[in-house]
Amino acid sequence: MRMLEKGKLIVASHNAGKLREFDGLIGPFGFEVSSVAALGLPEPDETGTTFEENAYIKALAAAKATGFPALSDDSGLMVDALDGEPGVYTANWAETEDGKRDFDMAMQKVENLLQEKGATTPDKRKARFVSVICLAWPDGEAEYFRGEVEGTLVWPPRGNIGFGYDPVFLPDGYGKTFGEMTAEEKHGWKPGDASALSHRARAFKLFAEKALNVVSAPAE
């Protein structure tokens, strides 16, 4: 495992919601953080067929363009009744004809498909969020960290705090959707903690432990 040394770190994302979450997760570690959005760098075409491939495409492009290590996330919603869709195409399902993204439309699309399949009870609406974080260096070397969280899709959407599909995702064991949770509730992790809730926080926890050598408390 290649360790990440303190210094400048590029977050390879133009997604405002992801950038807010990364800012909260990376903040305690003392890196000089910038994003490809702030630097005006273009988004590479995500031509991969897995979360790992797309995360690498984004992180490597940012690392090569800036000369600094870059951190990216490729994430998505996988719905059991839809054979794992939308998966790596989660963001694509929200694309409109004018090139923008409408996640209200995307959530409705998922719900329509579930209704068509008769998936109206919680046991038929199981899903998971997946996040793969890629840390890439300008020389092309990379490390990967994967996090997943299981849950159930609810309808109608609940809450407007999060982004993307958060308002319809109810994580197992909780009474709030991600869209109803504060950032602290959703991520449920800070350096040294034993556990994390969200898929991105779980992936980031692995990144912190393996690439930054952060020691977490043992899980109870």
From Swiss-Prot:
It catalyses: XTP + H2O = XMP + diphosphate + H(+); dITP + H2O = dIMP + diphosphate + H(+); ITP + H2O = IMP + diphosphate + H(+). One of its GO terms (cellular component) is cytosol. The active site is at D74 (proton acceptor). Keywords: Hydrolase, Magnesium, Metal-binding, Nucleotide metabolism, Nucleotide-binding. GO terms for biological process: nucleotide metabolic process; purine nucleoside triphosphate catabolic process. Substrate binds at S13, H14, N15, A16, G17, K18, S75, F163, G164, Y165, D166, K186, H199, R200. Its EC number is 3.6.1.66. The keyword Transmembrane helix does not apply. One of its GO terms (molecular function) is dITP diphosphatase activity. SUPFAM superfamilies: ITPase-like (SSF52972). Binds 1 Mg(2+) ion per subunit. Mg(2+) binds at D45, D74. Pfam families: Ham1p_like. InterPro entries: dITP/XTP_pyrophosphatase, ITPase-like_fam, RdgB/HAM1. It is an enzyme of class 3 (hydrolase). It comes from the Bacteria. Its cofactor is Mg(2+). Belongs to the HAM1 NTPase family. Pyrophosphatase that catalyzes the hydrolysis of nucleoside triphosphates to their monophosphate derivatives, with a high preference for the non-canonical purine nucleotides XTP (xanthosine triphosphate), dITP (deoxyinosine triphosphate) and ITP. Seems to function as a house-cleaning enzyme that removes non-canonical purine nucleotides from the nucleotide pool, thus preventing their incorporation into DNA/RNA and avoiding chromosomal lesions. Homodimer. NCBIfam families: RdgB/HAM1 family non-canonical purine NTP pyrophosphatase. This is dITP/XTP pyrophosphatase. It comes from Brucella melitensis biotype 1 (strain ATCC 23456 / CCUG 17765 / NCTC 10094 / 16M).
